Amino acid sequence: MEGLGEMKPEMMYGSPWYEEYTRIAPHPEDFDKLFAKKTQMDKQIKDLPAEAIRSIKGPTLLIIGDSDLVRPEHAVEMFRLLGGGVFGDTPAGLPNSQLAILPGSSHVTLVDRADWLVSMIDAFLEAPIKSE
């Protein structure tokens, strides 16, 4: 999440998040203060060791945008740690984990892709769980 350090509050001006905050907050002029606090909070998030991610046994659906703060390379790395990225045309079949990288999307604009998200999430939730 090294991209967090590059984020500035003015980068969010005009975004749906900014517009909603300034509409409902008791002190809309404090958006920059909120952003600074959120940035500090995000920097406190500890990286999970690869073994901790590898130990997740439940089906996992990773979704990012191709212009997301989360780099595609990082999402692919996570996907592989979760058992994905293997050749699925074998008797073993597809892994329980799935990765979706939505084109023309950012972390914020993913919410505008409900038509894509709903169909992907429904299919993921309906998929049979393969025993490991």
Regions found by a protein language model. Name each.
Residues 1-21:
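Flexible "cap/lid" loop of the alpha/beta hydrolase fold
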Residues 16-37:
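Short glycine/proline- and acidic residue-enriched helix-loop micro-motifs
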Residues 53-57, 92-94:
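Short, conserved loop/helix-junction motifs that constitute active-site signature segments
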Residues 56, 62-64:
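Short beta-strand/loop motif that positions the catalytic acidic residue
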Residues 66-69, 104-106:
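Acidic beta-to-alpha connecting loop that harbors the catalytic carboxylate
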Residues 69-77, 110:
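Conserved alpha/beta-hydrolase "acid-adjacent" motif
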Residues 89-132:
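Catalytic active-site module of serine/aspartate enzymes centered on a nucleophile-bearing elbow/loop
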